Amino acid sequence: IKSLPPSFSTNITIKTITDSTLTSSMLRKVLPFLLFLISMAASAQQYVRKTNLPTVYINTFNNAAITSKEVYIYATMHYVDENDSIAVYDSLQIRGRGNSTWGLAKKPYKVKFKTKQKVLGKGRAKAKSWTLIANAGDKTLMRNAITSFMGEFAGLKFNPAAKFVDLVLNGTYMGNYQISDQVDVRPHRVNIKEQDLPLTDTSDITGGYFLEVDGFKDGNCFTTTTYNVPIRIHYPDEEDIVYSQNQYIRNYVTQ
């Protein structure tokens, strides 16, 4: 439009309240504003809530399919909250997540923002990484959320967030999802004492640590001697942890 401005040989009369005459030069001035209003109206109609829940719209670059749990692809996100306010995130990455759940038709995802975001508001983490849980194996869609709420009621120190939303991915409605915390070490998540790295001969290696009882042996993992239970060490990271810390954890768990 900028390279081909409209040109008229005669004036155009537009019927308005004042019955005024709009010249071609005036039209050139107001046309960008009119196009902006049309664009805003179209955007408002495009990003609306599907139900009474918030709706998350994610569009990947070139509508690329999400096929990997390891490789992120770029995307944008529009978050329509309960009050129909729209938050726009124009630079994020998304990939698959989960173990057995990744093989189901309704897949879970992990999103990573360019900067830390307080997606769920006050009292929740400000972080780059968040998860979209599909709850595909749960017909009620509520077991994970109920477990989190029960943990809060019991006074557990950390309970993953449980915010239900509708997900639209590349224009396709995917159904009900749950925005949840990526389980990692930070305030409002797993808030443990982080160790000073690199370690010295006098460093205190008694904690904190972040371990997971896992059914899958991946990452920095060991198996308990008595019950043969896989334990995964999430913190310190695999590239940061040293031999003395690994041995301390194994001895502590198997005592």
Question: What are these regions, as identified by a protein language model?
Answer:
Residues 1-7, 13, 17-46:
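Bacterial Sec-dependent N-terminal signal peptides
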Residues 45-255:
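Phosphate/dinucleotide-binding and metal-coordinating scaffold of catalytic cores
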